[in-house]
């Protein structure tokens, strides 16, 4: 199409968005029982490239749930922000004499500290409660109680690629 000036042209571009989400389900069985899992994942939540993932797994003696999110460009800073929360409840009181509840929270980010040197700090917080009965092993009885753990994790990454997706130069 011609523009308002002979040197200008109007270009019309039609963009068709592809599906960015997934739904998954699975089931299995074995000598220790059966398992059923269900998950939902979205790779472009709110059209901003935010990845959201949730999973729920059931087995004969346990239930596990997790919700995680990764924002690759948090507040337009070119720094990512990732969070995850999960909980696992296992009940083996009848067979092995113990019951465990574990809750976890994780928070992390990444940013370029110096040219091509990236810093990835994160903090993980875990709380576990272990209950036993006289049927439990001696080692499990010694571990009975509440545990709180905090871990600071970091990674340094030196990246000389010319681009992250399909690089043609660098390492």
Question: Which sequence ranges carry the predicted segments?
Answer:
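Gram-negative/organellar outer-membrane beta-barrel architecture
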Residues: 1-171
């Amino acid at each position: 199409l011609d523009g308002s000036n002979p040197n200008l042209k109007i270009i019309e571009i039609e963009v068709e968005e592809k599906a960015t989400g997934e739904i998954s389900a699975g089931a299995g069985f074995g000598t220790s029982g059966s398992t059923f899992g269900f998950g939902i994942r979205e790779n472009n939540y709110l059209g901003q490239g935010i990845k959201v993932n949730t999973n729920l797994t059931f087995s004969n003696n346990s239930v596990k749930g997790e919700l995680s999110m990764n924002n690759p460009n948090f507040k337009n800073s070119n720094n990512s922000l990732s969070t995850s929360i999960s909980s696992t409840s296992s009940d083996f009181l009848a067979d092995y004499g113990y019951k465990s509840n574990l809750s976890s929270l994780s928070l992390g980010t990444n940013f370029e500290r110096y040219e091509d040197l990236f810093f990835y700090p994160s903090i993980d917080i875990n709380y576990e409660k272990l209950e036993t009965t006289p049927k439990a092993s001696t080692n499990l009885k010694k571990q009975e109680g509440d545990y709180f753990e905090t871990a600071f994790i970091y990674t340094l990454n030196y990246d000389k690629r010319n681009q992250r997706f399909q690089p043609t130069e660098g390492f």
